[in-house]
C-alpha cells in the first residue's frame, strides 16, 4: 500500500523533499491551501548562497513560493548571495535585516507587490541588488520600494526580463 498523504493546513510549517530526503536548509509556512502557496520563513543554511526557489514539493504536492517571510535572513552573518524565485510577490518586514555580509541580491521585479519595513536595513554597504524587470518603469518602481525598505548605500542593476 502506498503511504497516505497528510493534507496541508494553513500556517503549517513544512520542509521540502528532495531525492526522497527532507531538506533542513529552509522552512516554509503554508499560506494558502487551495492556491498551493507557501512563504519562505527561515533558513538554517550555513552556506554563503541561498536560493529561494520558484516552487517546492511537500508530500508529493507542488507548492508555489510566493513570499520571503519576516526576518527570514535577519542577522544571518554567513549569507553573501540570495536569489529570489520568480513567484515572489512579497518580501516581509526585516527579511534581510542586519544580514551584514549580504553583498548580492537578485529579485524578480515583475512580480513583487510589497516589501516590508526595514527589509533591507543593515545589508552590506554597496550590496548589489539586481532587479529583473520587463521595463525601466517597473524597475524604477521596485527600486523605490527597496529603498523605502531601508536599502541605503546599495547599488542597483537593471536586467531586462519578460
Locations of regions flagged by a protein language model:
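Beta-strand/loop substructures that line and gate deep hydrophobic ligand-binding cavities in soluble
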Residues: 122
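Acidic-aromatic substrate-binding/catalytic surfaces of carbohydrate-active enzymes
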Residues: 41-43, 74
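Short, aromatic/basic amphipathic alpha-helical patches
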Residues: 137-153
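Structural signature of tandem-repeat unit edges
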Residues: 30-32, 45-67, 77-90, 100-114, ...
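Intrinsically disordered, low-complexity repeat and linker tracts
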Residues: 1-31, 40, 149-162
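N-terminal-proximal low-complexity accessory segments that begin disordered
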Residues: 37-41, 130
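Structured segments of extracytoplasmic/periplasmic soluble domains
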Residues: 71, 75-76, 98, 145, ...
